[in-house]
């Protein structure tokens, strides 16, 4: 883990005390260094506190593994060995790592795109889905600019990312475009991506690997004079033109309530999986203008947030 990750881990562990200072322990796995997951975690900690489980009664052990299979597995294993009372994960890869490491500890996930399709399901697990309709994102994009080819940057080893890429292919006939799949296994591979002459827009999938390389991907798209779209919150601040994502506050709050119920003795099977009800649409007018894209007023009116 890099120095930066350790610093961020310390900053996010505001609700944690040294092991043994509280009656209960909650383990959390945050995939990569994503601003969206950081916001989810803040909402999670606040929600847990409102339910009566603050730093005086619960220790929070946060793991921020690099976005690769070995790191996810190691993070889950460390928390299982620590004998936490509940395990929480943000993103599908971390959730799958938890499933593989324990069948007895209650598990809670948040921010998972299409949980069932990604295999994020177990008898000792519940959570809140992070899926919003991809078709809605494409409708908004079509209002902004015509497109016949969309490049999707994803990771073949992150099942929710793969599912999103597959859904994009399924929407080709409805919207009249072709999908250009661009797989990367590590963030540094994003530098090799070429969009010019190949795509009219770029979708950065929900992949933790792809989102760690967001600044590189956005820059490559700028050079190709094409917009970037996303379904991960916080990406518009990095130059994404159009972002449609589930509210991180809702995701974290729901996870917090679920963990509180588990700490009180309920079983995961008695807590139904939730779906997002709050969706945030962010339009980056500044980036759109730099690309020569005129955003229609009705799209601006629909936006939850506009970056000027």
Cite the ranges covered by each PLM segment.
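Short hydrophobic alpha-helices and adjacent helix-cap/hinge residues
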Residues: 21-308
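Bacterial N-terminal signal peptides that target proteins for export
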Residues: 1-8
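N-terminal signal peptide c-region/cleavage motif recognized by signal peptidases
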Residues: 16-18
């Amino acid at each position: 883990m890099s120095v930066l990750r350790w610093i961020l881990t310390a900053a996010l562990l505001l609700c944690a005390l040294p092991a043994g200072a509280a009656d209960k322990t909650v383990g959390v796995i945050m995939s990569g260094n994503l601003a969206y997951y950081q916001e989810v975690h803040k909402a999670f900690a606040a929600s847990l506190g409102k339910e009566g489980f603050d730093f005086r009664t619960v220790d929070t052990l946060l793991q921020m593994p690099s976005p690769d299979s070995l790191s996810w597995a190691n993070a889950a294993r460390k928390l299982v060995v620590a004998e936490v009372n509940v395990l929480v994960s943000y993103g599908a890869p971390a959730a799958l790592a938890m499933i593989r490491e324990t069948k007895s500890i209650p598990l809670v996930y948040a921010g998972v795109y299409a949980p069932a399709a990604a295999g994020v399901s177990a008898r000792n697990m519940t959570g809140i889905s992070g899926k919003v309709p991809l078709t809605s994102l494409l409708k908004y994009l079509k209002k902004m600019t015509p497109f016949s080819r969309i490049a999707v940057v994803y990771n073949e080893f992150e099942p929710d990312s793969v599912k999103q890429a597959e859904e994009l292919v399924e929407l080709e006939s409805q919207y009249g475009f072709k999908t250009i799949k661009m797989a990367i296994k590590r963030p540094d591979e994003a530098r090799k991506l070429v969009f010019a002459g190949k795509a009219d827009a770029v979708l950065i999938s929900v992949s933790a690997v792809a989102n760690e390389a967001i600044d590189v991907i956005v820059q490559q798209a700028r050079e190709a004079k094409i917009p970037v779209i996303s379904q991960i919150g916080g990406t518009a601040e990095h130059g994404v033109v159009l972002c449609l994502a589930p509210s991180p506050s809702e995701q974290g709050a729901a996870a917090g309530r679920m963990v509180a119920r588990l700490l009180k003795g309920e079983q995961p099977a008695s807590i139904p999986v939730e779906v997002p009800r709050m969706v945030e649409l962010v339009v980056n007018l500044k980036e759109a203008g730099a690309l020569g894209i005129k955003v229609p007023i009705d799209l601006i009116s629909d936006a939850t947030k506009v970056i000027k």
